[in-house]
Structure formats: structure tokens, C-alpha cells
Design a protein with these regions (language model features):
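Residue-level detector of alpha-helix boundaries and kinks
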Residues: 70-71, 207-208, 247
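N-terminal "pre-motor" subdomain/linker immediately upstream of P-loop NTPase catalytic cores
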Residues: 12-141, 150, 296
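Charge-patterned, long linear interaction tracts outside catalytic cores
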Residues: 371-384
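P-loop NTPase catalytic phosphate-binding loop
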Residues: 1-20, 63-67, 102-103, 121-236, ...
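Surface-exposed substrate-engagement region within the catalytic domains
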Residues: 322
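Mid-core helix/loop region of P-loop NTP-binding domains shared across ATPases and GTPases
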Residues: 237-254
Length: 402
């Protein structure tokens, strides 16, 4: 009699545990999809016939993440090769899937929606040299690019037409005009396409400006000469780089050398030689490149230049081949959706997926106009020529526009 009672009690406890486990899984969302059945049907398993096991599901406003524990022998590519079947199973667009791996765990991420990101001249204004470029789709945190950091020196922005390159460039330049004085940063702009950057010709920060392609060799040669003058000054004052010089001595500004659509200079050996010099030697002198192109192929950006550029902002590409040329294998730029949807690769971010900030032309013009009307008495920048001539630093301003 007592045995029957214990057996009945044990059965009840087992059933209760099963019910509790079932409801726990439902609460965690683990029963939403039968992944075990899916993996068997599409044959994601190892030689021992072991399958991935769903370990966790987490969601944010923008991304839903499925975490799987994978037995030895199952590769990340096994998931990627079946992205179409997995997207159908989850009832989502295939382009919204992201696959990644960390040791024995594989993550399938589903983009639920992209945040709306508008550059706000008040909210996004900063005192440092970090430039807000967008919001992380995974953490929703503001992603900053410090263009003065040695690990981030030089940048190219690349992607297909319509991906958002021009807007990204407008955000970067507008933010610097909005946040930094001319004693901190200045621009040398090659406006190859003659359209998107014309308003910056009138910005206080712009010291050199040209349109089209004629004369680019002389323009860049002058930049190299400026770099050489800066290094002579650094040597004279026993400083390793411009950052140290600015801390110890005077505020020579960082110079951002912007070249829009570098494909226009394909085959121009003089152009490539000067860009190569600036890419390999410019960082210490605070001469930093910002290059824009659809595709930085070898003919447009040789390895002697590309290997010295530490920041890549990749936007949507037509296919994985173009994505690999821009940001390396498995960079996944072909999965981006355009309109500022991007990935950043620099010293702090290894392919962080972001929704880039948007700035309208009207806001950009307002920032430039407001900056040009500022009548505050500000400490002026020192020029390399001033220091070369042994004049008292600060007596000569960089431009009458200051």
C-alpha cells in the first residue's frame, strides 16, 4: 500500500516538474520554434549525429538573439549555408539574419527594426575629438569614432551608391564644425564630385579647398609639405607626435584631408604617391586622411595605402565579393539595408553594426552659418609657418575666416 502511495507521489512530482519545465521554457521563449526538428531536417549535425541545442533567447527593441550550444564538429558556415531555411522557419527576411560564434556557442540574431537616428547639434555636441556616427543595433548605445586616436588613424568610407556615404561624411564634418574650434581641427577638402561638400568651402575650418580633379597633384603636394613642416617643429620641441605637442606647447590643429570619390584618380601615379606618403607618415603630424569611394579595389587603393588606414566604415554592397574588398572576409556588408545601415571597423569596434546618424542639408548649412557668425574671442591656432619663423606663437591666425 505504502509503495503504491510513493509511486503515485513520485509520478505526480515528475509530471509537476515536466509542467514547470514546460512553462519555464515558454516563459523564456524556448518553445516558440522547434529548432531540434529544423536542424534534423536541414542536417546541421556532426559526424556523431549530435545537433545544436537552443540555450537562450534574448530580445531588445531592435534585435532578437537565439543562442545555441554546438557540439564539436559543427561550423558556423553550417548555419550560414542554411540561412534561407532558417529565415523561413523564423518567418523573417533572410537579410535580417546575422550569424556569429564565440567558442562553443553560435548566435543567430534577427534585426527587428532599425533605430531612427537624427543628428542633433545640441544633444550630440562634444568637447573631445570623438565623433558620433550612429547607434549600435545590438546595444542601442551611441557609437563614437575618435579620429585622433593612433589605432583609428585615417579612414575610408565605402559602399554602393545609395548606402549613405555622403550623409556619413556630412555628419562627420558638420559635427566637427559644430563641436570644435579651428584651433583644434581644420579641413583640406577635395570636392571631386562638386556637389555634396560645396557648403564646407565657406566653413571657418576649411583651409584648403578644390573641386574636380585638375590640380590634385599640387594640392596633395602642399599637404605633404605641411606634414614635413610639422615634423620639423615636433623635432625642434622634442615631441613624438602632434598630440603630445598640443599638450605641452601650442595648439596646432589636427588636419582632416578629405578626398571624395577617390576612384576618379585611378591610374594617377602622382596622386597615389602623395596619398601613400600621407597614409604612412601623416598620423604623427596630425595629418589624417578621410577617403570616400564605392569600392577600394587594388587599382584605386593599393595595399601600400590600404594597410595604413585603421578605420573602415562600410555601408551596403551589392554582393559578398565587394564586401570582402571593403572590410575583409565574412564582413557581411551585402546584408545591410542601405540608408546609413553600416558597420565600423576600427581600434575599438570590430564590425559593430550601426544605424548611422542622419543630418539634413538644412541642418548642415545652419551649423556652418552659425559657426561663421560666432563673434566670441577664442584662442587662435598656431601655424607651422609661425613657428618656423620663430615668431611669437598665436600672433598669426590660420585664416581671415577665424
Amino acid at each position: 500500500m505504502s509503495d503504491n502511495v510513493f509511486e503515485t507521489l513520485a509520478d505526480c512530482m515528475v509530471k509537476s516538474c515536466k509542467i514547470l519545465f514546460k512553462h519555464s521554457k515558454n516563459a523564456l521563449g524556448l518553445n516558440t520554434h522547434d529548432f531540434d526538428k529544423l536542424f534534423k531536417e536541414i542536417d546541421i549535425c556532426n559526424k556523431s549525429n549530435e545537433f545544436p541545442k537552443l540555450a537562450n533567447i534574448s530580445s531588445s527593441e531592435y534585435i532578437k538573439t537565439y543562442t545555441f550550444k554546438t557540439p564539436i564538429g559543427i561550423k558556423l558556415n553550417s548555419f550560414k549555408e542554411h540561412s534561407e531555411e532558417i529565415s523561413c522557419f523564423l518567418n523573417v527576411d533572410e537579410s535580417d539574419l546575422r550569424f556569429s560564434r564565440d567558442k562553443n556557442k553560435v548566435y543567430i540574431k534577427v534585426i527587428l527594426k532599425k533605430p531612427t537616428c537624427i543628428y542633433d547639434p545640441v544633444e550630440h555636441k562634444r568637447n573631445d575629438f570623438k565623433i558620433p556616427i550612429g547607434y549600435s543595433l545590438e546595444t542601442t548605445k551611441l557609437i563614437l569614432w575618435d579620429f585622433t586616436a593612433s589605432t583609428n588613424a585615417h579612414c575610408y568610407i565605402a559602399g554602393s551608391s545609395g548606402g549613405g556615404k555622403s550623409v556619413m561624411l556630412r555628419v562627420i564634418l558638420s559635427h566637427l564644425v559644430n563641436s570644435k574650434s579651428k584651433r583644434d581641427v581644420e579641413f583640406s577638402i577635395i570636392n571631386t564630385k562638386r556637389v555634396d561638400l560645396k557648403d564646407f568651402k565657406n566653413a571657418k575650418h576649411t583651409v584648403n579647398y578644390m573641386t574636380g580633379i585638375d590640380g590634385v597633384e599640387d594640392f596633395l603636394e602642399n599637404e605633404v609639405d605641411e606634414m614635413e613642416r610639422r615634423y620639423k617643429i615636433l623635432e625642434k620641441y622634442d615631441c613624438d607626435d602632434l598630440t603630445e605637442f598640443r599638450e605641452k606647447e601650442y595648439k596646432i590643429p589636427y588636419r582632416l584631408i578629405v578626398v571624395e570619390e577617390i576612384s576618379s584618380y585611378k591610374g594617377n601615379k602622382a596622386y597615389q604617391r602623395f596619398i601613400e606618403i600621407l597614409a604612412s607618415q601623416g598620423r604623427g603630424a596630425g595629418m589624417l586622411l578621410l577617403l570616400i569611394t564605392q569600392l577600394p579595389s587594388h587599382e584605386i587603393m593599393p595595399n601600400t595605402i590600404k594597410c595604413n588606414i585603421n578605420t573602415t566604415i562600410g555601408l551596403k554592397t551589392k554582393d559578398s565579393i565587394r564586401s570582402e574588398i571593403i572590410a575583409g572576409s565574412d564582413s557581411g556588408l551585402e546584408n545591410l539595408k542601405g540608408n546609413g545601415h553600416a558597420k565600423i571597423f576600427d581600434g575599438y569596434n570590430d564590425g559593430e553594426e550601426i544605424q548611422g546618424l542622419f543630418i539634413s542639408k538644412e541642418t548642415m548649412k545652419d551649423i556652418i552659418t552659425a559657426n561663421s557668425k560666432q563673434n566670441k574671442r577664442v584662442k587662435v591656432a598656431v601655424t607651422t609657418k609661425t613657428l618656423d619663423d620663430n615668431k611669437f606663437p598665436g600672433m598669426e591666425v590660420l585664416s581671415s575666416k577665424l
